[in-house]
Amino acid sequence: ILLMGVDTGSGSREDPWAGNSDTMILVTVNPQTKETTMTSLERDILTNITSDGETVQAKLNSAYAQGGAKLAIKTIQDLLNIHIDRYVMINMKGLVQLVDKVGGITVNNPFDFDISIEENEPEYTAKIAPGRQEINGDQALVYSRMRYQDPEGDYGRQKRQREVIKKIVEKVLSLNSLSHYKGIIESVSDNMQTNISLDSNSLLQLLGYKDALSTIHQYQLKGEDATLADGGSYQIVTSKHLLK
């Protein structure tokens, strides 16, 4: 399952799906081993993007902006040489709604300062104090977007994004009610796109994967930093990085 978070900027864009897929996490759910893996894909990975018979080299996150979810999925499939069965895409407003609907989540701010993005994006004023904190949707959005203060930069941000997803999954599973699940999905339906059927029968089938979601392993696809002739910063991923 490919999870994509679409960066809609300040939220002032007329199209709530206009933007780059700045969050891309590949989720593999294995009911036999009862384990799930989450692998973050760096948005700046330099890769081939093929559309309408033409191939260009560009950043991985631009595939969505060029051709929507279909092209983003195809590009990642080509890069990793895998088949992606399903996708779930959520925009920034949807993340806020989702966290609020499950009653907030508990995260651990590892820094000795408040996490915020107000300096770069004044419209987002939420802050997260150091240590273990119960946060709402607005705070979860800031927590999963901040990168300039993080010594690990975008890798640190992706680590926090995986933490937020893991905490949402844990909170949803703790509800243990089909009606609760349906209510959560309905609350974010305008700000979520997916090719997973979400009717009652399908939700019951998805509950068969519940045990596999109790153990989640987290990974990060890392390449080598590079600045190319165009002045842009990229991640160069080789077969060595992919095999690792």
Feature roles, as predicted:
Residues 1-244:
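Non-catalytic, solvent-exposed segments at the cell envelope interface
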